[in-house]
Amino acid sequence: MTLGLNITHQNKENKTGRKTIGNIVPDNWVYVQDRTVKMGRFQIYNNWSPYLVKDLSHTVWMGLEYFCNEGDRMWTMEDADFARRAIREMVTLKLIDEPSKVLDYHVERVKKAYAAYFDTYDQIDTLVKYLNTIDNLYCVGRNGQHRYNNIDHSMGTSFEAVKNILSGRTDKSNIWNVNTEQEYHESTNQENEVEVD
């Protein structure tokens, strides 16, 4: 689940030396490692693109991400209750001073947001072959390709799809080949495992 927030102030000042609009921290997303909150990650949409934010000089759009399961206690919370909880966590993390800094919010529940690599996943190539027979279907992003891609790779699949549409290219292998280079992925080799006594 994600809570999108438009806030008037962000307490985290940019001390990196990297220039940002409004001198906000330059990160796109930050993983939260604080056991006192349930938030898993927050995003700063201003840093994705300044065109996503109407008033760059005075506001920051953030997304607070929570990892939960469809139908569980968090998933079924009323939007206002979920927002209050998340905003309290922003105060706890000192991202904002007080709840009144929040101008607006939007709750988004994304079903099956993460790809699952079990059951019949070993037959994904058969599915891809079939999907590629549908001329005007371009499978992009995490859910479209059922892959655990980062946002840059997910956006890359969209860019490739647009290139194909504009050029009339019918072979979709370039779209499916985004993020298939193995050196990027975490190693699963036993030689890299650490033995613990």
Regions found by a protein language model. Give the residues of each.
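C-terminal lid/capping helical subdomain adjacent to the catalytic/cofactor pocket in oxidative enzymes
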Residues: 106-108, 117-197
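Generic macromolecular interface patches on structured domains
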Residues: 96, 100, 168-171
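FAD/FMN-dependent oxidoreductases across multiple families
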Residues: 24-26, 37-51, 98-113, 117-137
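Mid-domain catalytic core of redox enzymes
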Residues: 1-95, 173-183, 190-197
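General structural signal for secondary-structure boundaries
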Residues: 3, 78, 97, 117-121, ...
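Residue-level detector of alpha-helix boundaries and kinks
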Residues: 71-75, 112, 142-146
